[in-house]
């Protein structure tokens, strides 16, 4: 829970985003100040009219009335411009905060995403930033306007009659006590409400992502119950927040204002005429009480939103300040030449406690293909994670062209490694943009890459060809078509190293022959590392490494490993037997 000091820290940091918009903010504040000055003058004009002209209407009285209504019109126009300027500042600040949060998120390492639900991140970048926007566009201007109005009104009241002003000021300590009490009680409830909203987003994202599995295994009722539980808890805390607002805000503040009226009227009735207080002055004071209390009522009504904004800003800043980055590179000056890879006694653990890779050593050169096989959890994909620098290894060396992998920049490393995953990921856009990945790739290069992997044939059959739209995750294409597009994307980037992470695992046997032909062409002249479930797809590898519990237990060609009669032989025999049973 945020304490008072943390809230001030968050608020000061939010205010720092105002710096680039200093002139715009100054103009907005100027218009707000002008609005409050006009509001303060209007009751004086009314008071003067009541005392001087109400019983003696003449041409000058008409002029005073015109001034009175003209001030109201001017106040409306000036207030509109001020609010408009504040809204522009608000949206600009939220844009900057989202930009900073997204930029930092893009640099975070895989370990952060392993432990943070996607829905929680989305909630911070959308819901929480929208709450911050509400604070700047409405609440902040209300707070500043309230301060201006309070000070100008108080000054005008003191000039008009200090005795009546002293009576009104007796209520101020009660107001500040009320606001402080509300602040203390509301913070915890608001933080819990925002946290539960984040949980709802996470649960929604998880269910949408896994809807096929949920329906296939009849998990709808169980997950509905889990969602209802979180949703109900959110409702409970939301109702608590509303109840707190209803108790401490308008009813309490309105009661204080009515008490102020009562005290003022009683004092006027008891001593008003004897000490020379005019009806016009009394009218002006009633108006000033409204102007004194109404901004305070508005501020207290917006206080819950301010508290919510403080909590939301704290969550967004936590994302901006997150430093679980990808492994750091050293000087980053090295360039990939051939793409020769060597692991020397590499050990790796995701949590620093449980080893995933234990003393891994192997090498592969340009034009060669090696493969890693093993049961689930044996460490196959972890080797790729280490090579791609998604995670930092604890000991050993990883060399690329005999240069420590840390001496390459992330950009140099990633642009020379083509990664093809088991589940090809396509972005919302077009086929052309998915192959080019928004790089400076010509249409001819895109088409050549597609033709190289035999994807051109089905693309040309589409009504819009390479400009055909791609829906989210490419759901309108078959698995084989999505994989061919992923191959074309890799070829278009012209990498020196090719990594195939079970690239054919989800493809049917009929499509596999086409995909394998494309893979064979892609591997030519490149350093290739393949992770395979189907052993039939890696029989032509120069060397096959068998992993078990993070260690290499066997290595050799397909024929050598079969002759060895070990783990690989058993795995191959099981797959061959399963294949025979299906025929």
UniProtKB/Swiss-Prot annotation:
GO molecular function ontology, one term from the record: ATP hydrolysis activity
Domain ABC transmembrane type-1: 25-308
One GO cellular component, as annotated: plasma membrane
Positions bound to ATP: 374-381
Membrane topology, as annotated: Multi-pass membrane protein
Domain ABC transporter: 341-574
InterPro entries assigned: AAA+_ATPase (IPR003593), ABC1_TM_dom (IPR011527), ABC1_TM_sf (IPR036640), ABC_transporter-like_ATP-bd (IPR003439), P-loop_NTPase (IPR027417), Type_1_exporter (IPR039421)
Keyword Transmembrane helix tagged: yes
A Pfam family: ABC_tran
CDD domains named among the record's database cross-references: ABC_6TM_TmrA_like, ABCC_Glucan_exporter_like
Transmembrane segments: 26-46, 61-81, 135-155, 159-179, 259-279
Keywords: ATP-binding, Cell membrane, Membrane, Nucleotide-binding, Transmembrane, Transmembrane helix, Transport
Subcellular location: Cell membrane
Similarity annotation: Belongs to the ABC transporter superfamily.
Descriptive protein name: Putative ABC transporter ATP-binding protein exp8
Provenance organism: Streptococcus pneumoniae serotype 4 (strain ATCC BAA-334 / TIGR4)
Gene that encodes the chain: exp8
């Amino acid at each position: 829970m945020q304490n008072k000091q943390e809230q001030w820290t968050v608020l000061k940091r939010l205010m720092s985003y105002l710096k680039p918009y200093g002139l715009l903010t100054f103009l907005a504040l100027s218009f707000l100040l002008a609005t409050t000055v006009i509001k303060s003058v209007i009751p004086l004009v009314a008071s003067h009219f009541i005392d001087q002209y109400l019983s003696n209407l003449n041409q000058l009285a008409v002029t005073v009335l015109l001034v009175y209504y003209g001030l109201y019109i001017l106040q409306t126009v000036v207030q509109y411009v001020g609010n408009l300027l504040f809204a522009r500042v608000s949206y600009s600040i939220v844009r900057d905060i989202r930009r900073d949060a997204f930029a930092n998120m893009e640099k975070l390492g895989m370990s952060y995403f392993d432990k943070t639900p996607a829905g929680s991140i989305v909630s911070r970048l959308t819901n929480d930033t929208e709450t911050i926007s509400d604070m700047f566009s409405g609440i902040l201007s209300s707070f500043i306007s309230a301060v201006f109005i309070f000070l100008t009104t108080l000054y005008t009241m003191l000039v008009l009659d200090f005795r009546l002003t002293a009576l009104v000021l007796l209520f101020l300590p009660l107001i500040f006590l009320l606001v402080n009490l509300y602040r203390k009680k509301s913070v915890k409830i608001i933080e819990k409400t925002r946290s539960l909203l984040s949980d709802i987003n996470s649960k929604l994202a998880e269910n949408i992502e896994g809807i096929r599995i949920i329906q296939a295994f009849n998990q709808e009722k169980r997950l509905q119950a889990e969602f209802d539980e979180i949703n109900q808890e959110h409702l409970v805390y939301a109702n608590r927040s509303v109840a707190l607002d209803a108790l401490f805000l308008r009813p309490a503040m309105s009661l204080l204002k009515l008490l102020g009226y009562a005290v003022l009227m009683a004092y006027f009735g008891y001593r008003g005429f004897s000490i020379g207080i005019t009806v016009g002055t009394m009218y002006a004071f009633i108006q000033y009480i409204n102007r004194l209390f109404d901004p305070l009522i508005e501020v207290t009504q917006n206080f819950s939103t301010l508290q919510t904004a403080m909590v939301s800003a704290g969550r967004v800043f936590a994302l901006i300040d997150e430093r679980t980055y990808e492994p750091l590179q050293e000087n980053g000056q090295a360039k990939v030449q051939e793409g020769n890879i060597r692991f020397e006694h590499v050990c790796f653990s995701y949590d620093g406690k449980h080893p995933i890779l234990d003393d891994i050593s192997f090498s592969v050169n340009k034009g060669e293909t090696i493969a890693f096989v093993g049961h689930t959890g044996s460490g196959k994909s972890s080797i790729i994670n280490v090579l791609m620098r998604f995670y930092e290894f604890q000991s050993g060396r990883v060399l690329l062209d005999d240069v420590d992998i840390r001496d390459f920049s992330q950009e140099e490393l990633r642009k020379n490694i083509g990664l093809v995953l088991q589940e090809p990921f396509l972005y919302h856009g077009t086929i052309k943009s998915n192959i080019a990945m928004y790089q400076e790739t010509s249409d001819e290069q895109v088409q050549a890459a597609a033709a190289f992997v035999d994807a051109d044939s089905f693309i040309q059959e589409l009504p819009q060809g390479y400009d055909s739209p791609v829906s989210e995750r490419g759901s309108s294409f078959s698995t084989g078509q999505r994989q061919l597009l992923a191959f074309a994307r890799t070829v278009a980037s012209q990498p020196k190293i090719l990594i195939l992470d079970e690239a054919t695992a989800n493809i049917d046997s009929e499509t596999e022959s086409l995909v394998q032909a494309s893979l064979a062409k892609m591997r030519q002249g490149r350093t290739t590392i393949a992770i395979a479930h189907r052993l039939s797809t890696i029989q032509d590898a120069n060397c096959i490494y068998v992993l078990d519990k993070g260690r290499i237990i066997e290595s050799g060609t397909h024929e050598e490993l079969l002759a060895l009669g070990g783990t690989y032989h058993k795995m191959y025999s099981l797959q061959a037997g399963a294949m025979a049973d299906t025929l």
